[in-house]
């Protein structure tokens, strides 16, 4: 415990919780306080000016990060015929219909994203209690129920992140790894914030993007001054 306490004291001495850091400085600081032996993810939290208790203010969607997330993404697709062929060609690891549903029911789910063509939802709909709790249930609002399954596969492979506002009005997602360059992380953050602005509910009034903070997997949050970003 003493080691953890010492580390936290050192980190606290380097980070001013009241300060909003310029983006590049925030990423440099994030790397500086990272002391674990694995390559941490860079996570971002965005506080939005919405009331998620109201259905017309629930912000959800997806963003394709220009520099990816640094993660290898395995994709499963529910489709048949030409759509299934297109999904395989796009790089999907698993493609099927009833046979894939049977594997899911057995607990064989070696994939990170599930995509479905609209005509496959009669099969996928039966898997809600299995896929839903794992955050894998396809949904048209985030582009995982689509006629163009090949594009959805390519987007997922390229580093698409999905987001949904939580009960506190905050979006949590990842924008890369600590070994990304600051420019790459900045571009990813800009893309995410741009997409969040596009997803602003019409009924949302006042300041929409209220606060942005970044952190590594095991690190503390660092407040970011996003006023100079290209969003």
Swiss-Prot record:
Residues in coiled coil: none
Lineage top rank: taxon: Bacteria
InterPro entries listed in its UniProt record: Ribosom_uL1_bac-type (IPR005878), Ribosomal_uL1 (IPR002143), Ribosomal_uL1-like (IPR023674), Ribosomal_uL1/biogenesis (IPR028364), Ribosomal_uL1_3-a/b-sand (IPR016095), Ribosomal_uL1_CS (IPR023673)
Pfam families: Ribosomal_L1
Keyword line: Repressor, Ribonucleoprotein, Ribosomal protein, RNA-binding, rRNA-binding, Translation regulation, tRNA-binding
BP-aspect Gene Ontology terms: regulation of translation; translation
Xref: PROSITE patterns: RIBOSOMAL_L1
Keyword Phosphoprotein: no
GO CC annotation: cytosolic large ribosomal subunit
Record flagged with keyword RNA-binding: yes
GO molecular function, one term: rRNA binding
Disulphide bridges, residue numbers: none
HAMAP family named among the record's database cross-references: Ribosomal_uL1_B (MF_01318_B)
Function: Binds directly to 23S rRNA. The L1 stalk is quite mobile in the ribosome, and is involved in E site tRNA release.
Similarity-based family: Belongs to the universal ribosomal protein uL1 family.
Subunit field text: Part of the 50S ribosomal subunit.
Protein name, entry field: Large ribosomal subunit protein uL1
Native organism: Francisella tularensis subsp. tularensis (strain SCHU S4 / Schu 4)
Gene responsible for this protein: rplA
């Amino acid at each position: 415990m003493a080691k953890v306490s010492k580390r936290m004291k050192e980190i606290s001495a380097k980070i001013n919780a009241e300060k909003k850091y310029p983006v590049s400085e925030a990423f440099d600081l994030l790397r500086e306080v990272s002391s674990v032996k694995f390559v941490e993810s860079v996570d971002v939290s965005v506080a939005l000016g919405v009331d998620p208790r109201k259905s017309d203010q629930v912000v959800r969607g997806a963003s394709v990060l220009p520099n990816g997330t640094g993660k290898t993404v395995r994709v499963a697709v529910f489709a048949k015929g030409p759509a299934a062929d297109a999904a395989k060609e796009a790089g999907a690891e698993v493609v099927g219909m009833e046979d894939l549903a049977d594997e899911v029911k057995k607990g064989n789910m070696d994939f990170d994203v599930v995509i479905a063509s609209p005509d496959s939802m009669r099969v996928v709909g039966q898997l809600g209690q299995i896929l839903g709790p794992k955050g894998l249930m396809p949904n048209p609002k985030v582009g995982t129920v689509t006629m163009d399954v090949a594009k959805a596969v390519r987007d997922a492979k390229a580093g698409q992140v999905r987001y949904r506002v939580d009960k506190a009005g905050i979006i949590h997602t990842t924008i890369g790894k600590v070994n990304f360059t600051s420019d790459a992380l900045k571009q990813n953050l800009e893309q995410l914030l741009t997409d969040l602005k596009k997803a602003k509910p019409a009924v949302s009034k006042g300041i929409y993007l209220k606060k942005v903070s970044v952190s590594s997997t095991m690190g503390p949050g660092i407040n970011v001054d996003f006023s100079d970003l290209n969003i």
